[in-house]
Design a protein with these regions (language model features):
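Juxtamembrane helix-start motifs in multi-pass secondary transporters
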Residues: 28, 137-143, 229
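A membrane-interface helix-boundary motif in multi-pass transporters
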Residues: 12-34, 219-233
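Small-residue hotspots at the loop-to-helix junctions and early N-terminal turns
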Residues: 107-111, 115, 200
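Helix-loop junctions at membrane interfaces in 12-TM secondary transporters
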Residues: 156-168
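Structural signature of the two symmetry-related core transmembrane helices
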Residues: 139-154
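Substrate-agnostic recognition of the 12-TM MFS/MFS-like secondary transporter fold
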Residues: 1-13, 29-45, 77, 81-92, ...
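Short amphipathic helix-loop junctions that connect adjacent transmembrane helices
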Residues: 93-110
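Juxtamembrane intracellular "pre-TM" segments in multi-pass secondary transporters
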Residues: 48-80
Length: 233
């Protein structure tokens, strides 16, 4: 969060300077590249404790997958919930483009959007983790949906830049509430089963829907159908 906050401030300063497009964005991408490279390099030296790997036969693995897909009701409910949550994937760019067209704000505001988004994400990620531990992670997951809904409502009825700032605060809150609850819910309903199998299955099922929402909403935006896109989200 601190790194993203610093990046948001840097981005705002870069975009406020008299640097022509696309050089201004190019500088931002160069900073992003070196930040990712440094992060990857540092992570390379991370040491993990050795785990005893329990080998399974292919037949056993297939049997486990079949059981999860066909018989685990909580897995089904969680998966359907996550499929609909995929609609929020293109939300950040969608809100930014829509609000830019509506209010014609200075492009440097993107840096401030990032700062607000990251602060909100960090605060609500921490808060939802505690809330989930106390009242169940389903509660935190519901908060994630609520905040994304508030972002959509704010966009539809936005009349000034204050509401635009609120949109990105709500997005950050939704993302922050989602991150701890999504993983912890898997641990809750997987119990003593292989969590990696559950996670792999969920990602495999979600991938086509994520692509569908990204392409579908992208197509609607190109047609100028922003309001319809918000209704879908």
């Amino acid at each position: 969060s601190i790194g993203a906050l610093t990046g948001g401030i840097a981005l705002k300063n870069i975009l406020e300077k008299n640097i022509q497009f696309p050089k201004n964005f190019g500088i931002g991408f160069i900073i992003l590249f070196f930040s990712l490279a440094i992060g990857t390099f540092v992570f390379y030296f991370y040491k993990e404790k050795g785990n005893e790997i329990k080998k399974k036969s292919l037949a056993t693995f297939k049997k486990e997958i079949k059981e999860v897909i066909l018989k685990r009701a909580n897995f089904h409910r969680y998966l359907f919930s996550r499929i609909f949550y995929c609609a929020t994937l293109p939300a950040m760019g969608l809100y930014a483009v829509y609000c830019q067209n509506k209010f014609n704000f200075n492009i440097s505001e993107v840096g401030l959007f990032t700062i607000l988004n990251v602060i909100s994400m960090g605060v609500f990620s921490y808060a939802s983790g505690h809330l989930g531990d106390k009242y169940g992670h389903k509660t935190s997951m519901l908060l994630a949906y609520l905040f994304h809904f508030l972002a959509v409502v704010s966009a539809l009825f936005s009349k000034n830049m204050f509401i635009v700032y609120c949109i990105f605060i709500f997005i950050g809150a939704g993302q922050g509430a989602f991150m701890p609850s999504a993983m912890n819910l898997i641990y809750d309903f997987a119990k003593d089963k292989d969590k990696k199998t559950y996670m792999a299955l969920i990602d495999s099922f979600l991938a086509p829907f994520a692509i569908l929402f990204l392409l579908g909403i992208g197509f609607l935006v190109n047609q100028g159908q922003f309001i319809l896109s918000f209704y879908i989200i």
